Amino acid sequence: MKRSGVGSLFAGAHIAEAVPLAPLTTLRVGPIARRVITCTSAEQVVAALRHLDSAAKTGADRPLVFAGGSNLVIAENLTDLTVVRLANSGITIDGNLVRAEAGAVFDDVVVRAIEQGLGGLECLSGIPGSAGATPVQNVGAYGAEVSDTITRVRLLDRCTGEVRWVSARDLRFGYRTSVLKHADGLAVPTVVLEVEFALDPSGRSAPLRYGELIAALNATSGERADPQAVREAVLALRARKGMVLDPTDHDTWSVGSFFTNPVVTQDVYERLAGDAATRKDGPVPHYPAPDGVKLAAGWLVERAGFGKGYPDAGAAPCRLSTKHALALTNRGGATAEDVVTLARAVRDGVHDVFGITLKPEPVLIGCML
């Protein structure tokens, strides 16, 4: 990192030049950015983006906006990049309403809610990244999604510069998606400034729905448990799968699950189930979905020949986690191209075997599958 200082154009936000982005992402890949503007308040975020977006209309490059860097793959050749980093991290609680600024560490939000006796977020414990990223792709795990509890989101409209609250109903949440999700990470039309959650003040968790978690708690489906006990069970399950970031463990340097679980028609599921029975491959893990049948992407990946730790060559800079076949991990020296190359191989291999195309979950900046 070279020069740093405070930017008067950006309401006092901190500006640093020549900043390596790899340490700011959970995958630990990325270029050296031309400058990073770190905003510790919503006012700084709005001021910075209004100025930079106005400049972009006259030919300047649009900035990349992120906070925790947990869902990004950024190409190393983007050396002229300007980054607006969200570090506005306030968390406020009013009764059963929890409001988290975009840069708040999401797991800190979960902890604060549980400490206040509020249920609803405990199944999402240990998910890396910021609160502001959660509504964008409707983050979920262990039978829960943030759409279960989000009431509204405060947004900056980058086209008009307007700041407004938008109700959950208008966010059109779906499986790992919302109206906020955009394929081009450099052309995102809105930026989340704050998220509001309405939680259960009863002191009990949301109803348990996920079989593995239910078994770990020795509970029954639909039971409401102690939120802290649920959190501890979830963290233990995530740790066993390498899904809790550990800076000393390359097996956790990832974006989490790289591919979403595909939703297929009933006919496609029945074909796969029949083929699996013929091969004596065991039952096909599946779950009901509003528009079909949701399959377990990890099962497809492993049955297509990509086992945990693939490729086995110890020198491979990017490999599947040894604990979870959906996590593509940086073994210490991987580039974005290494990650994308492995992702392509896995995606194409699954398609060749099953005729199903897996879709990536992270945002790809300057690279594509």
Curated annotation (Swiss-Prot):
**Which residue pairs form cystines in this protein?**
none
Residues of the active site: 176, 257, 361
E.C. no: 1.3.1.98
The FAD-binding PCMH-type domain extends over 29-202
Catalytic activities: UDP-N-acetyl-alpha-D-muramate + NADP(+) = UDP-N-acetyl-3-O-(1-carboxyvinyl)-alpha-D-glucosamine + NADPH + H(+)
Compartment(s) of residence: Cytoplasm
User: Which keywords belong to this entry?
Assistant: Cell cycle, Cell division, Cell shape, Cell wall biogenesis/degradation, Cytoplasm, FAD, Flavoprotein, NADP, Oxidoreductase, Peptidoglycan synthesis
A single cellular component GO annotation: cytosol
Name the major location: cytoplasm
GO biological process entries: cell division; cell wall organization; peptidoglycan biosynthetic process; regulation of cell shape
Q: In which pathway does it act?
A: Cell wall biogenesis; peptidoglycan biosynthesis
MF terms from GO for this chain are: FAD binding; flavin adenine dinucleotide binding; UDP-N-acetylmuramate dehydrogenase activity
Q: Which cofactor does it need?
A: FAD
- Say what the protein does: Cell wall formation.
**In which family does this protein belong, per the annotation?**
Belongs to the MurB family.
Q: Which NCBIfam families match?
A: murB, PRK13903.1
Q: Which PANTHER family does this one have?
A: UDP-N-ACETYLENOLPYRUVOYLGLUCOSAMINE REDUCTASE (PTHR21071:SF4)
Q: This chain belongs to which protein, by name?
A: UDP-N-acetylenolpyruvoylglucosamine reductase
> What organism does the UniProt record list as the source?
Mycobacterium tuberculosis (strain ATCC 25618 / H37Rv)
Q: What does the organism's lineage look like at the top? A: Bacteria, Bacillati, Actinomycetota, Actinomycetes, Mycobacteriales
